[in-house]
Amino acid sequence: MIYRFKIKYNIKKLVEDNHIDILCIQEHCEESHLDSITIQQKFGLPNRCVFFNRQTAWANFGISIYSHYPIIRYGEINFNSEKNNSMWADILIGKDTIRVFNNHLQTTDVSMNGKKYEEYRSVKDWKGQARTLVNIVEQLKANFVIRASQAIQVRNLIDTTRYPVIVCGDFNDTPMSFAYNHIAGNNLTDGFRDRGKGYGHSFNGIKGLLRIDFISYDKSFTGLVYDSPHLPWSDHNPIIMKVKLKTTSR
């Protein structure tokens, strides 16, 4: 989540060190004393678009895209959720326009039940363990269904896009899931599979076993470099990808 000053400073350094031109944030937060313009200035990226899905007295929460290049159009994919939504932005690079999709799909949110399970397990409360496991399974099933619906919404918009497409975000699901595969369709290349190395996990919880954050692109792009460094200030590793637009006029 992007809200604490130190994290914003760390992201600024990440942007500068990696010469990042387009930055997609899935858990954007604007505190009352630090708005989008201020954050934008700290990141050093002059263009931005933000959508909020939850507002409180002290902060607004949502999703955002920051860009070195002009953003000429943008829109929200509204999931009617206080925690999750997606968005797109048409970005002008030279004389070419690309569309970037930034996604934060339904949160699995089983950590609390997982903690309860460990508590019951530590005292050998078998009935408590069983109840908690049932709750976890039911919660997982419900969230799978929600993510499937969200993935269909995102894919429908991808299919109507006439520009070169980049899709990224926190899918809260694995490469084996319906959500991942439906969004990928038959025309998007997974950046990790194209240029990544090793196991490639992106979520640092659950013993670092899961890759749930992705970047993919259509045939208009060539993947050059993929990196997902471990950073101590987030439970997700950032996905950093260098791609080349084949049709660029620059």
Predicted features and spans:
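Metal-dependent phosphoester-hydrolase catalytic domains
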Residues: 148-166, 171-250
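Structured beta-strand-rich core segments of catalytic domains in phosphoester-bond hydrolases
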Residues: 3-9, 16, 22-118, 229-231
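Soluble non-cytosolic domains of exported or imported proteins
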Residues: 2-5, 27, 141-149, 206
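Active-site beta-loop-alpha substructure in enzyme catalytic cores
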Residues: 134-137, 141-156
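Generic structural signal for well-ordered alpha-helical scaffold segments
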Residues: 12, 90, 155-159
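Second-shell loop/turn segments in exported
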Residues: 1-2, 22-24, 138-144, 166-168
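A solvent-exposed, charged loop/short amphipathic helix patch at secondary-structure junctions
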Residues: 115-139
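Stable alpha-helical elements in mature extracytoplasmic
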Residues: 7, 11, 32-35, 147-150, ...
